[in-house]
Amino acid sequence: MTPFLAEAFGYAGSLLCCLWSFARTRSTMLMVQMGGSACFLLHWLLQGRGTAATMTALLLGIAALSLFLDGSPDSPRLRLVRRLYLAALLPVALLTAATWAGVPSFFAAIGTVISCYGRWQTDPARHRAVLLASSVPWLLHSALVGSVPGICTDLFGLGRAAWLGWKRCCIGKPLGVRTGLGGAAATVKVA
């Protein structure tokens, strides 16, 4: 029963990792990401993978802190949350160094840094874009360790990023206007 539950939580986590980017608000994105992290935490615990479970728990805590990064820049509460967020990165860095396993760890570390930077962003579009960009190093990590669900999730993230980029660039502009080099708009005659 435990292997089945472990896999079920793993696939549920993968599904949530695919769905978070469809949320409209940053807090909803974070809540869905946290749901995915909770599923992966159970997945790793049931498989007896202590290091992965510990890292997932640490990153789940960072995501929870991210919920409180909104607010007035001069707010004492916001300053405290920012300090706690930065302090929470230290155990992540220490665990990464202590369990280093070569090239896969390198790509996991880059993916983690990009993800943590993305969760620091309070603008929903920037938050989404940076976190989707973290799919690149995570895809390389997943491929190196042979994680098929990880590869599928990361490819979905890259596809979602490409779709959102294309949608932003090419949809919603008036007919007859195309962006030229350097961002200058040139009018094209439409017959």
Give the location of each predicted region:
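Alpha-helical membrane-protein topology signature
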Residues: M1-A191
